[in-house]
């Protein structure tokens, strides 16, 4: 029948039999008929030995040791080895004890035989570690692990007192060394005492010097702090003065701007009045020009030339208006420049604006001259076409329209004003004598007309006669 077995915390169940190829390790399992189950205790066991060994000088000694040995629980392969090789025997049986003791004694003797007694005695810790490593290497074959190895002090074999003599030697060396150490300590104490006294005096002098230096440093730092504070106060005062000056400057700039705005507004108002007056004056002049044009139309020009004259007059009016606007802009720019001169940092800007305004006025004046020239060219061209390409008639019209004859008459009148000219004719008493002299005056007119024609290019009216022929 089936039996359910459970192992304790430090145990494993070792199961063999049917359905199991080799062995099976488990903490709990059903044990079937035809299967065998044994308990494998994993707790380590202490083994105490006194190993007798011999050094390289053939000196025997005893090595007391206590080894704590048990199965390696962290390796399944080691557990299987232990279950197969060791578990069939009792844990404290002579078989296991002899196995472990034989491994330890064999490795210890081999290692001791390669070392002198002095090396074993002075390198006890290293000797113990090498014994531990070599024994562990052999125990791995059986799945065993050394949990702890406590190798005691080496002991002499009876009849051989090497370690006791070595201990006495060590004691004497230690005693002598102690005496030397006491003498050296006494010497060092006296030297140290004198050294401490000298160092005390040196340190006192050094501290006094450092105290004076620190006091001077503190005084200097205090003076520097005072200077720093005074400097900061002065800097703060300068900053406040600069801010006040800046505020005053800003106020002056604002006042200048306000004054400028007021002056500009006043100038603009005056200029607007002047512009309006100019517009009205222009309108009056335009009406006068239109009236004059109407008169000229009735006397000299055809309907087409009258329309052209009207357009020319309108163009002249537009030109006049633009000139007035240019003058107004120029005046405004000059006013702005004069207002900006109130600010110290605007001199260059005002000069620049005045130059630009003057340039603009010159450009406008040039444009006006060009426009007038173009208009006059168109006017003369139209007038020439209207008069049938008669240059003489055009010239006469322009001279009449330009008032040249009136000006000549005016100049001549001014020249003879107050002379009160009189024509006196003296005759010899003949009846035809007076008329003959009058006829002589009329004979002088053709040469006069010829002179006028040569100077002005104008011909006298037909009713006044014709010019004398050049060949006559």
Curated annotation (Swiss-Prot):
Gene name per UniProt: FLOT6
Residue stretches in coiled coil: 237-327
Maturation and modification: May be palmitoylated.
Name under which the protein is recorded: Flotillin-like protein 6
Function description: May act as a scaffolding protein within caveolar membranes, functionally participating in formation of caveolae or caveolae-like vesicles. May be involved in nodule formation.
Keyword Iron-sulfur: no
Location (main, coarse): membrane
Lipid-anchored residues (S-palmitoyl cysteine): 37
InterPro entries in UniProt: Band_7, Band_7/SPFH_dom_sf, Flotillin_fam
Localization in the cell: Cell membrane; Membrane, Caveola
GO biological process assignments: nodulation
GO terms for cellular component: caveola
Record-linked Pfam families: Band_7
Organism: Medicago truncatula
